[in-house]
Amino acid sequence: MSSCSVTYGNKEIQDEVLVAKIKAGEYSKPMLYERLGQPSDVKSGSNRESRWIYRFRKADNDMFAYAPMGAGLLIGGKNGDVLTRTFYFNSNGILENATYSVEKLYTSNLMSLGRTIRANLDSNDSQKRVENEMKVIGKPFDSDLAADNQKLEDALSSD
């Protein structure tokens, strides 16, 4: 039985050579956008500081995902790693620091289906935050990319 891999998010953040060129004190928000594209989420601090969060996930179906007669939806899921890179900006929009982390994430197929249905019905805060930030820095906002990123953000907050 072969495994089915899926990927979500920004593949660029896996590239250590590319990311190593991003230097604190030298990079502005528009420069980071040009290097890595639109972030998955944007969070603001109390003194106009902010952080841009980029995520990438690669996941494989578990053995239960292939169960016959629709049982895979009920008992199957995906196992994978989520790589997160967070870039911290000062109040002038200059990069101060960057961090990365990797965490394991299991997502059940049934929960994924539920999140997809909810995402089509609800408004999504991370998409709004990213859209607002793109307006502030004068860069285009990709709503389709934001919707895909929202699914990963939701998986991290609910599974």
Features from the language model and the residues they span:
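C-terminal motif of bacterial Sec signal peptides marking the signal peptidase cleavage site
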Residues: M1-S3
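Residues within mature, well-folded domains
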Residues: S5-D159
